[in-house]
């Protein structure tokens, strides 16, 4: 999978390639990440990428010419990409969208800056995507969030089991995790995790996931389609709640 980013701050985005799972995936050629500097596609000695808005108003607007020069170069070099513009006006970035984008072979993420991008650039854009209902100074951080999330669904980047068991892929929040020591500051690891009974461990983990989801994300709980393990875990939760009331 190829993911490319167009930005005026390439050094900021390059960091995503240097650490952890993403770094290893790049080194093993599981994913290819290319970072391009929009200023390299300007035509003046000052490498200008912005100008004053027609009609007046605060701030600057990113000029269209560098984007179109870059896009022509990119298509000739790598083929036509699925082009994303980071934008607070876009679709909300969530797990379903992550899965959808992970199936694309050639992604291009355009990072906005200033007051926005000349509207004519939208001819090149397939998707506007927002990582939340708030405004950032630029699209570089959203681009890095997208790269990290999308890469995890690319085959071979992390284990299939890890992807399946992560929060949101099951429709629930993750269960609590524990490691050594067995007791710390008077707090013990739940006994069920030490007994080696995998069925009981799975049931406990599902019960904890359901409990956490009910408490923190009831919206997810209400959308969840429950399987048999969920139903058994919910019954246990209900019994515990009744016993606590008693």
Curated annotation (Swiss-Prot):
GO terms for cellular component: cytosol. It catalyses: guanosine(37) in tRNA + S-adenosyl-L-methionine = N(1)-methylguanosine(37) in tRNA + S-adenosyl-L-homocysteine + H(+). Its EC number is 2.1.1.228. The keyword Manganese does not apply. It is found in: Cytoplasm. It holds the Pfam family tRNA_m1G_MT. GO terms for molecular function: tRNA (guanine(37)-N1)-methyltransferase activity. GO terms for biological process: tRNA N1-guanine methylation. Keywords: Cytoplasm, Methyltransferase, S-adenosyl-L-methionine, Transferase, tRNA processing. SUPFAM superfamilies: alpha/beta knot. CDD domains: TrmD-like. S-adenosyl-L-methionine binds at residues 112, 131-136. Disulfide bonds: none annotated. Specifically methylates guanosine-37 in various tRNAs. Belongs to the RNA methyltransferase TrmD family. HAMAP family: TrmD. Homodimer. This is tRNA (guanine-N(1)-)-methyltransferase.
